[in-house]
Curated annotation (Swiss-Prot):
UniProt-listed PANTHER family: CALCITONIN-RELATED, ISLET AMYLOID POLYPEPTIDE
Protein name in the entry: Islet amyloid polypeptide
Main subcellular location of this protein, as a coarse class: secreted
Miscellaneous notes: IAPP is the peptide subunit of amyloid found in pancreatic islets of type 2 diabetic patients and in insulinomas.
Complex and partners: Can form homodimers. Interacts with IDE and INS. Interaction with INS inhibits homodimerization and fibril formation.
Record's keyword terms, sorted: Amidation, Amyloid, Cleavage on pair of basic residues, Disulfide bond, Hormone, Secreted, Signal
Organism: Homo sapiens (Human)
MF terms in GO: amyloid-beta binding; hormone activity; identical protein binding; lipid binding; receptor ligand activity; signaling receptor binding
GO cellular component, one term: extracellular region
Lineage: Eukaryota, Metazoa, Chordata, Craniata, Vertebrata
Family: Belongs to the calcitonin family.
InterPro entries documented for this protein: Calcitonin-like, Calcitonin/adrenomedullin, Calcitonin_CS, Calcitonin_peptide-like, IAPP
């Protein structure tokens, strides 16, 4: 009787371990946002042109330029700059 209980326990344990292996672990993944800045638009256009046709000469490799490539503007420096006076008043 003890051997039967051991076999049942091992089967249940095996099923439980297989279930744990098959269950994906939830992780905090950052979702990629659609970028609408000029840099990202330029990258998308370059990638489109590279992949759309090769009739324009040499195949250029796709660019990997994102909105964080050039960094963020420092708001303090922007506020300290003198205003540009294009039109004399």
């Amino acid at each position: 009787m003890g051997i039967l209980k051991l076999q049942v326990f091992l089967i249940v344990l095996s099923v439980a371990l297989n279930h744990l292996k098959a269950t994906p672990i939830e992780s905090h993944q950052v979702e990629k946002r659609k970028c609408n800045t000029a840099t990202c638009a330029t990258q998308r256009l370059a990638n489109f042109l590279v992949h759309s046709s090769n009739n324009f000469g040499a195949i250029l490799s796709s660019t990997n330029v994102g909105s964080n490539t050039y960094g963020k503007r420092n708001a303090v420096e922007v506020l300290k700059r003198e205003p540009l006076n294009y039109l004399p008043l």
